[in-house]
């Protein structure tokens, strides 16, 4: 994926012959850098929800027709993160393996038959909107993880479990952890619908739903409760 005029598009074709993973190097990294990796796996949850939504609405792209087999495989990778919260938090070998297994299926999308449709939806679209709005550079998993919660809330599917997983692992997705104010996030959330339609990102629930002040208040309450609970 590369950015062209602020829009992420998929270009190129290459098959890696071998990939070397040094567990000791990964285990020695700052925890937040590793924890950030869960964003690009948990996004399969909202990516699949948006893929199914676009199919139901008759707005799916011809190039990325819905594939239930790929969707189910992607959701199994999400379960791999949910079931390894403790291992990922301490970054032991099992935790690293859970991350590697999920990331090789999605981020390196050659593992999914060259189809990136399950990889991103509302989750990444919020990230792109905030990036465009603020000009900031983010630790990837933070805005994506926040987008997973926003997308799950919009779909009314799995938001509590996703937030518990993210906060229990230790990744802080509150706006203040990314150098944003709540006012900036609120502006980004309200801009999301117009931005994704203007840029022409593939169809998601974010294209159709207007985010209200009540939704933003609910999101803030959920985040504050999740992280206060983890610290108490």
Say what each PLM segment does.
Residues 1-74:
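A glycine/threonine-rich phosphate-anchoring loop and its flanking beta-alpha core
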Residues 3-6, 13-17, 142, 150, ...:
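Solvent-exposed, flexible loop/coil residues
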Residues 3-13, 52-61, 79-96, 121, ...:
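Short, charge-rich amphipathic segments
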Residues 37, 138-139, 196-197:
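A short hydrophobic/aromatic micro-motif that marks alpha-helical segments and, especially, helix-coil
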Residues 41-46, 50, 54, 60-61, ...:
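C-terminal charged capping/lid subdomain of soluble metabolic enzymes
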Residues 65-170, 176, 180:
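Active-site segments that bind and position negatively charged phosphate/pyrophosphate groups
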């Amino acid at each position: 994926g590369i950015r062209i005029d602020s829009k992420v598009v998929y270009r190129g074709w290459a098959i890696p012959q071998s990939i070397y993973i040094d567990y000791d190097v990964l285990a020695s990294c700052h925890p937040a850098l590793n924890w950030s990796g869960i964003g690009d796996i948990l996004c399969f949850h909202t990516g699949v929800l948006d893929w199914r939504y676009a199919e139901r609405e008759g707005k799916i792209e011809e190039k990325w027709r819905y594939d239930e087999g790929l969707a189910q495989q992607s959701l199994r990778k999400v379960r791999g993160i949910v079931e390894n919260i403790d291992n990922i938090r301490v970054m032991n070998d099992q935790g690293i393996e859970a991350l590697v297994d999920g990331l090789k299926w999605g981020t390196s999308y050659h593992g999914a038959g060259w189809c990136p449709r399950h990889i991103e939806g509302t989750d990444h679209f919020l990230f792109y909107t905030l990036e465009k709005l603020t000009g900031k550079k983010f630790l990837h998993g933070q805005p994506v993880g926040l987008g997973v919660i926003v997308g799950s809330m919009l779909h009314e599917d799995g938001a509590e479990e996703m937030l518990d997983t993210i906060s229990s692992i230790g990744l802080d997705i509150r706006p203040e952890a990314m150098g944003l104010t709540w006012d900036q996030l609120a502006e980004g959330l309200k801009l999301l619908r117009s931005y994704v339609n203007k840029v022409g990102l593939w169809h998601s629930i974010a294209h159709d739903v207007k985010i209200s002040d009540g939704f933003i208040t609910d999101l803030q309450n959920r985040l504050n409760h999740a992280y206060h609970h983890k610290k108490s």
